[in-house]
Amino acid sequence: MKVIDQFKNKKVLVLGLAKSGESAARLLDKLGAIVTVNDGKPFEDNPAAQCLLEEGIKVITGGHPLELLDEEFALMVKNPGIPYSNPMIEKALAKGIPVLTEVELAYLISEAPIIGITGSNGKTTTTTMIGEVLTAAGQHGLLSGNIGYPASQVAQIASDKDTLVMELSSFQLMGVQEFHPEIAVITNLMPTHIDYHGLFEEYVAAKWNIQNKMTAADFLVLNFNQDLVKDLASKTEATVVPFSTLEKVDGAYLEDGQLYFRGEVVMAANEIGVPGSHNVENALATIAVAKLRDVDNQTIKETLSAFGGVKHRLQFVDDIKGVKFYNDSKSTNILATQKALSGFDNSKVVLIAGGLDRGNEFDELVPDITGLKKMVILGQSAERVKRAADKAGVAYVEATDIADATRKAYELATQGDVVLLSPANASWDMYANFEVRGDLFIDTVAELKE
């Protein structure tokens, strides 16, 4: 960890705890800052705040009192999930207090070079693929960021022989100033998190912050399957390295079933350890990064062939009497489910879909679900999903919850079929998050096997 003194004896407010806020508070305290933590959860229900208080860090819980900002803070570090419309943040900005996320802190102290990965879909899988390939090549890829390990925590233990492989959300990237990865990846850009950003253009601008400090000596890996992303290529100082499954590019690309990097075959597409056209894109992004880091083709091929996926992202769960179960609970939008289905023969798929009703119809999904063996539909959005199934001519049954849906899907499947949980909806109508939903699917599959 780099020892820096820019926060020494400076008053810093950490707004919001969770993993990233807790890590930021401890780091700032270690760097000599005078830290105050403010979290909305009551103290008695807030183990993180209790621990920080025991460590001598000032905590204010149970709300966000605006008068707290009457103190002269030099900096605010906010939890990424707290929107900039929050009154505390608005007041801080009005007073000229810089507002950062802990990703910026991680950059400032990191001795390790940083590879940053952002995008709408595929971030976690691509981040994990890159980390595993670099580690296999002896470059020790340390996963951090939005993938579940606070970047500022991992940066404290990283040496210059490691590589920080950071998954970065738009929320995190809104709060960076000096952040400067040596390689950045944008997997794709789709309209999402508009409730947070207000406009798609604002969401894209937040993602684009990843390259703000990059120079021609740095590499920006972009998905040229998308015209929007391709158009952005002319707006960066970084050296652009494209990847595409649709055209031959000066980077990583798919041609005749083979994955190439600048004219050289790296591996066959069907050798990737996880199915789906989206995973071909993820693999191409990984290949581009790996080749920029001088990883040999054999190491890339062996690692991506053995790659088992990421939990809740088209994760193979089990095989029961010839029926394979896949957990794709992370597919919380139509595009993600479309990509999941692209990896299978529809006639052998029983799809479990439905969840939180956000008011959108599923007409875009009709071509992708046409020809499915059956569907099991559940959740608030069930009526809308059923309308799409009717248009596609797919028979369906309804379920009360994930356990019920999994059992019914298994009853409808026969040897050689696939039961695919890929809801195309968020989980919040029934479950706290997509992880809980996916875990219940996994647990039910285990019960069916007993």
Swiss-Prot record:
The keyword Cell wall biogenesis/degradation applies. Its EC number is 6.3.2.9. One of its GO terms (molecular function) is ATP binding. It comes from the Bacteria. Keywords: ATP-binding, Cell cycle, Cell division, Cell shape, Cell wall biogenesis/degradation, Cytoplasm, Ligase, Nucleotide-binding, Peptidoglycan synthesis. Pfam families: Mur_ligase_C, Mur_ligase_M, MurD-like_N. Pathway: Cell wall biogenesis; peptidoglycan biosynthesis. SUPFAM superfamilies: MurCD N-terminal domain (SSF51984), MurD-like peptide ligases, catalytic domain (SSF53623), MurD-like peptide ligases, peptide-binding domain (SSF53244). It catalyses: UDP-N-acetyl-alpha-D-muramoyl-L-alanine + D-glutamate + ATP = UDP-N-acetyl-alpha-D-muramoyl-L-alanyl-D-glutamate + ADP + phosphate + H(+). It is an enzyme of class 6 (ligase). InterPro entries: Mur-like_cat_sf, Mur_ligase_C, Mur_ligase_C_dom_sf, Mur_ligase_cen, MurD. ATP binds at residues 119-125. Disulfide bonds: none annotated. One of its GO terms (cellular component) is cytoplasm. Cell wall formation. Catalyzes the addition of glutamate to the nucleotide precursor UDP-N-acetylmuramoyl-L-alanine (UMA). Belongs to the MurCDEF family. This is UDP-N-acetylmuramoylalanine--D-glutamate ligase. It comes from Streptococcus pneumoniae (strain JJA).
